[in-house]
UniProtKB/Swiss-Prot annotation:
Active-site positions on this chain: C147
Cellular compartments annotated: Cytoplasm
The protein, known as: N-acetyl-gamma-glutamyl-phosphate reductase
EC number of this enzyme: 1.2.1.38
Purpose of the protein: Catalyzes the NADPH-dependent reduction of N-acetyl-5-glutamyl phosphate to yield N-acetyl-L-glutamate 5-semialdehyde.
Record key words, sorted: Amino-acid biosynthesis, Arginine biosynthesis, Cytoplasm, NADP, Oxidoreductase
UniProt source species: Dehalococcoides mccartyi (strain ATCC BAA-2100 / JCM 16839 / KCTC 5957 / BAV1)
């Protein structure tokens, strides 16, 4: 059986390493090339012993035949590489934010750089399979969604599409420390992060325009007001988002739950739960657990959603997108359930 060839540009970050872990056991795809400038010349399994079956050399550039290239570089660093990869006939999945926003001006405003290839922004497909499956299937370039937006959008989009709520939402999200990457900072070292919870980038987080853009599309072009407040919590993985939105008209708790169940009934990686979910339910999996509830006294909808920020929020969703692009079963390589404890 022919296997597709995959390559990872910048395997050494958390998202790149998680991609390597998932792809190693993928039945239809072979990970054949990985890059990492600071570790070029070393073997992946030597530097990261937990990836003991991956004896791949880490190189400066992708080598050999590659059908699908995953970019796991920080924002701004990978965008300029994409045209050359596409010219070589590769399908490209970018895990950074470089192709998520459609308006080039937003990159200057929110990310502080002028986009090097704005002509590709319209072509790039926003890779949230639950909303864009058909577009992803025919795409050359997929912009993998951010971790916070994945959790927030999946939690709110059924309510927006069903016209249940006013075009406004408050999103309170809490993330494990891996969401800040592998490079240590004062905020993320153990002595500072342990037994501590803090809010950050209040009203200025770069995922805010991404959430607003996709909720606008889901609501038929109505631009929503999105208030987004992220927090760091002392755990390694996981995001739990709690979204609040005003109901347009009275609706029962069961009616809302049924709307959500019907919306996601055919989705392999979204489960509407009977009780508020825990982040540990998603650890190491590509699942998103969602719990909608009506606050009847205040005429509010409250939606809790949680994901593993490195899997459904990054590498797992990227593999899900790859499966769709290659015409494979969407769940291939992503069937793992969480571990407990």
């Amino acid at each position: 059986m022919k296997k597709y060839k995959a390559g990872i540009i910048n395997v050494t970050g958390y998202a790149g390493l998680e991609l390597a872990r998932i792809l190693e056991s993928h039945p239809s795809v072979e990970l054949c090339s990985v890059t990492g400038r600071s570790l070029a010349g070393k073997k992946l399994s030597d530097v990261f012993p937990y990836l003991h079956r991956l004896d791949l050399p880490i190189t400066e550039n992708l080598e050999g035949q590659v059908d699908v290239a995953f970019l796991a570089l920080p924002h701004k660093e990978g965008a300029a590489l994409v045209p050359a990869l596409l010219e070589k006939g590769m399908r490209v999945i970018d895990i950074s934010a470089d192709f998520r926003l459609k308006d080039p001006a937003l990159y200057q405003a929110w990310y502080g750089f002028e986009h090097p290839c704005p002509g590709l922004l319209e072509e790039a497909v926003y890779g949230l399979p639950e909303l864009k499956r058909k577009d992803i299937a025919g795409a050359r370039l997929v912009a993998n969604p951010g971790c916070y937006p994945t959790s927030a959008i999946l939690g709110l989009v059924p309510a927006f599409k069903s016209d249940l709520i006013e075009p406004s939402a408050i999103i309170d999200a809490k993330s494990g420390l891996s969401g800040s990457g592998r490079t240590p900072t004062v905020k993320t070292i153990f002595c500072e992060a342990d037994e501590d919870v803090c809010a950050y980038s209040i009203g200025t987080h770069r995922h805010q325009p991404e959430i607003a853009q996709e909720l606008c599309r889901a609501s038929g072009g109505v631009i929503p007001r999105v208030t987004f407040c992220p927090h760091l919590v002392p755990m390694s993985r996981g995001i739990l988002s709690t979204a609040y939105a005003r109901l347009k008209q009275p609706v029962t708790d069961e009616e809302v739950k049924e709307i959500y169940r019907q919306f996601y009934k055919d989705e392999p990686f979204v489960k509407v739960t009977a009780e508020p979910p825990h982040t540990r339910y998603t650890r190491g999996t590509n699942m998103c657990f969602i719990y909608p509830v009506v606050d009847a006294l205040n005429e509010q909808l409250i939606v809790i959603s949680c994901i593993d920020n490195l899997v459904k929020g990054a590498a797992g969703q990227a593999v899900q997108n790859m499966n769709i692009m290659l015409g494979l079963a969407e769940t291939e390589g992503l069937e793992a359930m969480a571990t407990l404890p």
